[in-house]
Design a protein with these regions (language model features):
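Charge-biased low-complexity segments
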Residues: 23-181, 192-203, 212-226
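Membrane-embedded beta-barrel scaffold of Gram-negative outer-membrane proteins
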Residues: 141, 470-474, 480, 628, ...
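Periplasmic N-terminal accessory/gating domains of Gram-negative outer-membrane beta-barrel systems
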Residues: 188-190, 197-209, 225-325, 335, ...
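Transmembrane beta-barrel wall of Gram-negative outer-membrane proteins
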Residues: 355-379, 393-431, 447-469, 510-514, ...
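Flexible loop and strand-edge segments within Gram-negative outer membrane beta-barrel domains
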Residues: 417-462, 469, 477-499, 540, ...
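Signature of Gram-negative outer-membrane beta-barrel scaffolds
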Residues: 515-630, 645-646, 650, 750
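Gram-negative outer-membrane beta-barrel transporters
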Residues: 577, 584, 591-593, 688-690, ...
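C-terminal beta-signal and adjacent terminal beta-strands/loops
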Residues: 795, 799-824, 837-844, 848-903
Length: 903
């Protein structure tokens, strides 16, 4: 810092005292001719500092002003004049200062007397050592509770360190300009490092939100601490991330973290018993699900009551309903990514839990200093629980799932910042949906069996420069059986698939403002299929039917095999501009699809099968951008192209079309996020998606050979989703989500032939209407969810969830006639998807009590679904003559009491 130093020099060049000559003694008794004598010099007792003139500071030179000062007999300054100038600015400053001087007066002949003195006022510009200034400070809070954390060490590599105070605040003075590695650590925190840059003339103020470590019993602390320096990771532009602890406490989930996805914006409410994910108007199979980079076929067990992965292995779950980056593909809809947590290096940990739905357990322990393992599992018994409290076979009216799942995770440390994880998963589901009838021959059933297993290995390496490498090979097996008996010949589809994949990614900083990810994403499958029964079962999206309707009398059988392979390289770069306020993330993915089917035409006795191979290479550009206009207000937008290979079950030469190619979609979205407080945020997103080349059933009653399915359908979805969220902080968390959406389809009519039936009514209502959009079978106009949970203290917590969803579209039955071939009533349909199932409305509540000891903790809870006992319709059903309409309803009030103990 530059400071002005003012000096002054007193020059007693002359003294001007009154002079007189006396011929005789004056009145004072002085003899004539006495000469006055200065007996005491004036002494400066108050010095007034003159400011160094601002106009002269740039020149930086010294200056002196010589003045004559008149001092009276009391020591005051009565006048001052410039004798030697240094310039107007210096002269004015000196005159103003000396007029405020005061002196111990001079004495002449030992008496106070007025005098005039010559005074030199010196101006000297002196450079002093600058005062240390704060140019880097910040505050540290708990990522979950948002409370400040005291005692956290913040270290700047090669400079020094500071410790946060009770307010979580820290500060550094005179940190050298440029980039610095910052390490933040504490005894109960996960150590993190980041990179910050200090610029000239600017103070850097930051806020860090740190994640607490898992609690470790006393005496079991780990000496292993791994710190890496990594560039910031960009999330998808539109995504919602839920931490495991927050998800576990959501009412209606019974402590299952992954079930919270059903309550997020953009997700339609699935019908009970389906467990389907319908995101932004896409079909359930169009949304991709990954666990640590491993693709799995489903997120929930049959019925949607439980997820297929133990919540205690989950670190976080992220839902991107659309517009996601180039790292992922092969889906037209949303993206769900689940990250499993790191295993604890010391101590034996685990939990056991049970409620009326199922029981679950997990054990986690180290094998040695570098290897640790966790094993988890779950088994349902809901049917047995319900049989205790009801006098009737509830399974005849409500679909009751039967399931189990198991997981194993092993982590081995190869060295600092280098490890291998092995993850194994398995799940099995059975679900039966029944429509009873006094006549056993008329009982209608829908049965499904799903098995899948996965084993994956993840090699992770993070380098000192912040770059990282991730390699994830995986393999697995899927087995699916569906069986329908709605009168006539039963229909069955048996699918067996061996699947495999490999993901490789390198991520690093390529410049001061860019982070680039380069990767390879491989997936393939070898599948076999066996199908018998009606050519119209199971029903497809767009089919006009009602539950329990006897299938058409066209039956057939087929067995076939398929293989699929896609090896997709991708690149994505995050470009930060304007001090990281603007991020532009361009990316591109090259997706080659190779598909083979074993039969191009149906099997004919004595003729060898002729297979077919289809190949296409798709270019998928993606772009997203975020702009943080002010600290609390940001904007975002994204678009991208997406492709999806045909389902293997659709490549039958009898029931499908072996020449099917890829389906296509385009996503466009934009929105904003406003941070109301540190804990409360509001987000709104407008979205639009367009899909083409969708696979639909051939509209013709007599399709050409191997063309039971065609690929000229179109789809579109558009709407707005909003999310008002209070993050887990202190005692409360919750959110309000709402989605207003319309999802439509346009069917292919190019191969339509005249429909025939005795009355002609069916043809009029079932025929395709060229160019006309209709409602998607899973369309829901309004979906709203309100979730809240409050810690009452003393270990008690209460929460509630309210859900509202528009019912799915259905095609009305406007009449019936007796078919001549089967002597059964056949329905006459109205306009396709012109009515809806009544709206779904449900209130759930949860109350829990937690206990904590030094050796473990426990929780007991009561989670009540459908508190009001509302009979929510799930499907429309008719009697045998289609004159009376009813509904299959969901579960009544379901109180789920449970307990959990962990150590």
């Amino acid at each position: 810092m530059v400071k002005k130093l003012l000096g002054a020099t007193l020059l007693l060049a002359s003294l001007c005292a009154p002079r007189a000559s006396f011929a005789q003694a004056n009145a004072n008794g002085e003899t004539p001719g006495h000469q006055p004598k200065l007996t005491k010099l004036p002494k400066l007792v108050h010095f007034e500092e003159a400011p160094y003139p601002d106009s002269e500071t740039a020149a930086g030179h010294s200056a002196s002003v010589v003045l004559q000062i008149a001092i009276d007999e009391k020591g005051g300054v009565t006048d001052a004049v410039v004798l030697q100038t240094a310039g107007p600015a210096f002269d004015a400053a000196a005159l103003a200062a000396v007029r405020k001087f005061s002196f111990d007066p001079a004495e002449v002949d030992n008496k106070p007397s007025p005098v005039k003195i010559t005074y030199r006022y010196d101006f000297v510009l002196k450079i002093e050592a600058p005062t240390p200034s704060i140019n880097y400070d910040g505050e540290i809070k708990n990522r979950f509770t948002k409370q400040p954390i005291a005692g956290v060490k913040v270290a700047i590599e090669g400079f020094g360190e500071a410790t946060t105070d009770d307010a979580g605040h820290f500060e550094f003075r005179d940190v050298p300009l440029g980039k610095h590695v910052i390490t933040v650590s504490g005894p109960s925190l996960t150590t993190v490092s980041t990179e910050e840059e200090l610029e000239k003339g600017k103070k850097l103020s930051v806020k860090y939100a740190l994640e607490p470590k898992e609690e470790v019993p006393p005496g079991e602390e780990s000496d292993l601490e791994i710190v890496v320096i990594a560039p910031k990771i960009a999330k998808e532009v539109v995504s919602t991330e839920i931490k495991a602890e927050e998800g576990r406490r959501v009412p209606g989930t019974q402590g299952d973290t992954l079930k919270v996805v059903q309550n997020l914006p953009g997700v339609a409410r699935a019908s009970f018993g389906s467990g389907a994910l319908v995101v932004w108007g896409a079909a359930p199979q169009d949304t991709r699900i990954y666990v640590d980079g491993i693709h799995i076929p489903l997120l929930y067990h049959g019925g949607g009551l439980r997820s297929v992965l133990s919540s205690d292995l989950v670190k976080s779950i992220n839902l991107a309903p659309g517009g996601y980056g180039s790292e992922y593909g092969r889906g037209l809809g949303g993206l769900v990514t689940i990250d499993t947590r790191a295993l604890r290096p010391t101590g034996v940990h685990g939990f056991v839990a049970a409620d009326v739905i199922d029981s679950a357990a997990m054990v986690e322990a180290p094998i040695n200093d570098t290897t640790r393992i966790a094993v988890a599992g779950r088994k349902s018994y809901l049917a047995q629980s319900l049989s205790v409290v009801t006098s009737k076979d509830v399974g005849d009216f409500v679909p009751i799932p039967d399931y189990y799942d198991a997981q194993v995770k092993v982590t081995h440390d190869l060295g600092p910042n280098e490890s291998i994880d092995v993850l194994g998963m398995a799940a099995r589901d059975e679900l039966t949906r029944t429509l009873t009838n006094p006549d056993p021959a008329e009982v209608k059933k829908d049965y499904s069996l799903t098995n899948f297993g996965r084993v994956g290995l993840a090699y992770k390496r993070q380098f000192n420069d912040g770059s990282s490498v991730l390699l994830t090979p995986w393999a697995g097996h899927d087995h699916l059986v569906t069986r329908s008996s709605f009168g006539g010949a039963p229909t069955e589809l048996d699918t067996s698939s061996n699947v495999y994949g490999f993901r490789a990614a390198y991520r690093g900083r390529t410049s001061a403002t860019t982070v680039t990810t380069v990767g390879l994403d491989v997936e393939g499958s070898v599948s076999s299929y066996a199908r018998t029964g009606s050519v119209t079962l199971p029903p497809r999206e767009g089919d006009i039917t009602v539950f329990g309707q006897p299938p058409g009398d066209q039956v057939n059988a087929d067995t076939w095999h398929t293989t699929t392979l896609s090896v997709a390289p991708y690149v994505q770069t995050d470009i930060g501009l304007f001090e990281d306020k603007l991020h532009i993330v361009p990316g591109v993915r090259v997706e080659p699809f190779i598909t083979t089917a074993s039969r191009l035409t149906p099997e004919v006795a004595g003729s060898p099968p002729i297979g077919i191979t289809s190949q296409s290479t798709e270019l998928e550009p993606r772009l997203s951008s975020t702009y943080q206009m002010i600290p609390r207000l940001g904007f975002k937008g994204a678009f991208g192209f997406y492709h999806q290979s045909p389902e293997g079950s659709d490549l039958s030469s009898v029931f499908g079309n072996p020449t099917l190619g890829v389906e296509r979609a385009f996503h466009l979205l934009g929105g904003s996020t406003f941070k109301l407080t540190d804990q409360v945020s509001f987000e709104e997103v407008l979205f639009y998606s367009k899909s083409s080349d969708l696979v639909t059933r051939n509209a013709s009653d007599t399709p050409q050979l191997s063309r039971a399915l065609v690929q000229q359908g179109e789809g579109r979805a558009y709407g707005i989703q909003v999310l008002l969220r209070h993050e887990l902080s202190g005692r409360f968390f919750g959110w309000v989500s709402y989605t207003l959406m319309r999802s439509e389809r346009k069917d292919d009519c190019s191969e339509l032939e005249t429909q025939t039936d005795p009355t002609g009514v069916m043809a009029a209502h079932q025929a395709c209407v060229p160019g006309q959009w209709r409602l998607f079978d899973f369309d829901q106009t309004h979906v709203a969810t309100i979730v809240g949970s409050y810690d009452l203290g003393a270990g008690f917590e209460f929460g509630a969830r309210f859900r509202y969803a528009t019912g799915f579209p259905r095609t009305p039955v406007v009449g019936a006639f007796i078919g001549t071939r089967r002597d059964l009533y056949e329905p006459e349909f109205g306009a396709q998807n012109s009515i809806r199932i009544p709206a779904f409305v449900q209130l759930d509540a949860r109350v829990s009590k937690r206990f904590k000891w030094s050796w473990g903790k426990a929780e007991i809870y009561l989670d009540v679904q459908n508190v009001t006992d509302r009979a929510n319709p799930e499907e429309i059903v008719y009697d045998y003559s289609y004159t009376k309409k009813g509904y299959i309803t969901g579960l009544p009030t379901l109180p789920v009491a449970g307990a959990r103990f962990e150590w």
